[in-house]
């Protein structure tokens, strides 16, 4: 069965985010992480290509984790109370799983 490829961009609400896979060594040397969200337009998420190419739940976890940073930024959650954060993330995740370009890739990798 053919695997669904990670989309090159994801649109959630008014935000369009470019997904960029980078070599594992650079990912760890530059940010010591598996992914990084750039919160200035044009919005980008850099992802460790080894994890993404391997696929599965670990890849989904990294992508969803970085997309949640987008939601945090998009909904201005820095100084919000728990209910506002939970409500915003509920809405954001629903949008991510139901209408974004990532929905089929996520389903294929879980």
Regions flagged by a language model, labelled:
Residues 2-57, 70-74, 78-91, 110:
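Active-site scaffold of zinc-dependent metalloenzymes
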Residues 62, 66-70:
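Catalytic glutamate of the conserved HExxH
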Residues 104-110:
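Long, well-structured alpha-helical subdomains associated
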Residues 95, 99-102:
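Acidic/histidine-enriched, beta-strand-rich ligand/metal-binding domains
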């Amino acid at each position: 069965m053919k695997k669904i490829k990670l989309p090159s961009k994801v649109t959630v609400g008014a935000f369009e985010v470019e997904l960029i896979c980078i070599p594992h060594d650079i990912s760890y040397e530059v940010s010591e992480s598996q992914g990084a969200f750039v919160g200035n337009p044009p919005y980008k998420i850099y992802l460790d290509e080894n994890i993404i190419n391997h696929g599965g739940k670990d890849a989904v976890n990294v992508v969803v984790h970085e997309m949640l940073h987008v939601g945090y930024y998009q909904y201005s959650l820095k100084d919000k109370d728990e209910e506002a954060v939970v409500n915003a993330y509920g809405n954001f995740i629903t949008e991510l799983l139901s209408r974004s370009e990532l929905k089929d890739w996520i389903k294929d990798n879980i």
